[in-house]
Amino acid sequence: MDYIETAILNCYGIREAEQNMVFAARLTQHGHTIQNMADLMDLYRQSYSQKTVENIAGLPHPTVQKFMVITVAVVGASRRFLAQITRHQNEVKYMSASLQYSNYSGHAAFAIPYGIMKADKEIQDIYKKSCQSDLDHYAELCALGIDHDSAGYATPQGLRNVLIISATPYQWKHMISQRTCRRNTDETRIVMLQIWQRLYKLSPILFAPDLTGPFCQRGSCMEKQMSCQNPISKLWIPSDILKADYPLLIRREVSSHKD
């Protein structure tokens, strides 16, 4: 799953999410001191420490983490990833590039699954030939006057896409926890680990492993007999997981930076 890029479109949202979370928590205990809007704004502007963020984020009261949304862009992930990630609907909004309104003739590209990337060249060629054939047939259908929506059914699941995801901090943590588990598909794990890595860089406390990672990092596996029996270290941050589980991607990233 190379050439997948992620970016947080409103980095300021992380800071606002922390501030709103602390403010909402404080409000529950200071209602008797607020007589007017000026009092409320004084409470809103009160400073706070990272320890305060840590304490509140660890409480079983998710509502305080729902007063801000963080918007993330994903470029290059497949439409199969789109089908999987959009199962999450609570407090999440999506906007995707459209097969109906976009003409991919001559512009389409397809993602290469990590399992194919690791395989012999012969296997890689079989996969690439199959995807390219689908894209060629799509372009041929469009050239014959078939509308883009109908022709889109001929495209492969691996067709690269552009996706915007907007969610509350609490829901981001829920999605990351669910989708970075080693029982998920490689592409979904890679994308969500990349997103987590960016969120963690901006707020290592709010998105700490013990608050954001899969079940095995936050306690113990809850999959029972479906467990992978290969728990992730509780000390690992997202970059550590990427290095351990997807070393080929890391090597390619390092190589591209050198070039």
Model-derived features: positions:
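Family-specific signature for flavin-dependent thymidylate synthase
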Residues: 1-259
